[in-house]
Amino acid sequence: MLLGVNIDHIAVLREARKVADPDPLDALGICKRARADQITIHLREDRRHMHDMDAKNIIELSALPVNLECATEPSMIDIACRLRPHRVTLVPEKREEVTTEGGLAVTGEQTRLQEAIKRLQEKEIEVSLFIDPASDAVKASSDLGVEWIEFHTGKYANIYAMLYSNLSKTHHSIPELKLPRSVLKKMLEEELESLSALSAEARVLGLKVAAGHGLNYHNVQAVAQIEEIEELNIGQSIIARSVYTGLEQAILDMKSLL
């Protein structure tokens, strides 16, 4: 199982004080030393954490492959084509969201996606689509000719958190998941079964499969056991643990679970 370490939250910490430190660039050598397989960054349209210079420096200087997440807006594709990372993962964006809330509406945005994918692949950039776990999204992704899909695991992570953490007792509780434990357990089981079946479906169609969003040290193993998933992209939980253990140990701890 490959691990892509998302270092966005280093930039989040920097932007909390609008200063120059910590610099996400400093994480590159640590990630490599800890045997991460990939660096993942999200250059958002609103530049709320990573900025253009961050993306440029990271892509140019990283010894590990860089997976650049970005929206399908032509201006963002312009940047991706200029920087030429190893891979671009196309993601949906809403300016008001705290984090990416769901997968791309692949079946409803095919014209825009086709143009973005064509431009990226002409620059010999691998393309991945960040999608919800749904059969129609898998099929549409295959039809678009991309190399990868990445399943949005946010629903699985939210159910797990409401079931096995104290999230339900905090102000971050998820109202629609305030359900009996027996119901949540069934939902969690169904979500994992769906991820497994859809990953197998994707592999039959020739797609490589990644997954990410909300994965942490408590919930990751069940997803990592799905054989058809080749890669996990994980960020916030690793950066959060690094506050206490250091980044290298936090990555090693995650690698030990995969």
Curated annotation (Swiss-Prot):
The keyword Transferase applies. SUPFAM superfamilies: Pyridoxine 5'-phosphate synthase (SSF63892). The active site is at residues 42, 69, 213. Pathway: Cofactor biosynthesis; pyridoxine 5'-phosphate biosynthesis; pyridoxine 5'-phosphate from D-erythrose 4-phosphate: step 5/5. It catalyses: 3-amino-2-oxopropyl phosphate + 1-deoxy-D-xylulose 5-phosphate = pyridoxine 5'-phosphate + phosphate + 2 H2O + H(+). InterPro entries: Aldolase_TIM, PyrdxlP_synth_PdxJ, Pyridoxine-5'_phos_synth. One of its GO terms (cellular component) is cytosol. 3-amino-2-oxopropyl phosphate binds at residues 6, 17, 214, 235-236. GO terms for molecular function: pyridoxine 5'-phosphate synthase activity. 1-deoxy-D-xylulose 5-phosphate binds at residues 8-9, 44, 49, 99. Gene3D superfamilies: Aldolase class I. Its EC number is 2.6.99.2. Keywords: Cytoplasm, Pyridoxine biosynthesis, Transferase. Coiled coil: none annotated. One of its GO terms (biological process) is pyridoxine biosynthetic process. It is found in: Cytoplasm. The record marks 150 as: Transition state stabilizer. Its main location: cytoplasm. Homooctamer; tetramer of dimers. Catalyzes the complicated ring closure reaction between the two acyclic compounds 1-deoxy-D-xylulose-5-phosphate (DXP) and 3-amino-2-oxopropyl phosphate (1-amino-acetone-3-phosphate or AAP) to form pyridoxine 5'-phosphate (PNP) and inorganic phosphate. Belongs to the PNP synthase family. This is Pyridoxine 5'-phosphate synthase. It comes from Sulfurovum sp. (strain NBC37-1). The gene is pdxJ.
